[in-house]
């Protein structure tokens, strides 16, 4: 079921009830002009099929754009194929994902809404589907519920991951996306783990 925002209506200038006079004004973010300041944060739907954009995903984000949101940040989008965060999440780790993203971006753009892809590497938070190799992390520390400890990611692997993030961002651009957000929050996934003293016990330049 699509969810719109029927309450997104501009109030008259000087209206004493309007406590946020700039909410519906455009805002400049880098090279992008967003039509208003109502942003949709990343919210997982798990509507992808084998990491590919589906019609359900297009309808989901299209409904929010149609409702008046100025900018949408997508749910997590993985940058490499080895580790899957959750079944039903999206990826853009090779060019085969670009056509689906082109359709998604076109759907959102027809309503004047911008869309960013939230790029992510799940690392020690990856879903342990059969065949998944040992999970990686900044160091040997994993979440409390893990059945086995992850292995520390190597410096060589980190160089590859940097390239994979860059290549994923380029694919988003090719598909018509307006930018990317890098998920590095609350010790969640690889980059968030590097920023947390609970998970990052390294003694090298990455510690």
Residue ranges and their predicted role:
Residues 5-207:
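Flavin-dependent oxidoreductase catalytic cores
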């Amino acid at each position: 079921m699509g969810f719109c925002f029927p309450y997104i209506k501009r109030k008259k200038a000087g209206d004493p009830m309007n406590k946020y006079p700039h909410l519906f004004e455009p805002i400049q973010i880098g090279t992008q002009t967003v039509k208003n300041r109502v942003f949709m944060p990343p919210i997982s739907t798990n509507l992808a099929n084998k990491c590919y954009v589906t019609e359900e995903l297009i309808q989901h984000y299209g409904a929010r754009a149609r409702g008046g949101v100025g900018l949408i940040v997508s749910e997590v989008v993985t940058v490499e194929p080895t580790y899957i965060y959750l079944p039903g999440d999206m990826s853009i780790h090779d060019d085969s994902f670009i056509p689906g993203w082109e359709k998604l971006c076109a759907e959102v753009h027809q309503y004047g809404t911008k869309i960013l892809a939230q790029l992510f590497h799940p690392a020690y938070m990856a879903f342990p589907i059969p065949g998944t190799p040992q999970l990686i992390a900044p160091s040997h520390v994993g979440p409390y519920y893990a059945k086995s400890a992850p292995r520390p990611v190597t410096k060589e692997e980190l160089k590859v991951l940097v390239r994979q993030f860059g290549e994923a961002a380029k694919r988003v651009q090719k598909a018509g996306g307006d930018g990317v957000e890098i998920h590095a929050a609350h010790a969640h996934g690889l980059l968030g783990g590097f920023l947390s003293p609970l998970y990052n016990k390294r003694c090298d330049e990455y510690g």
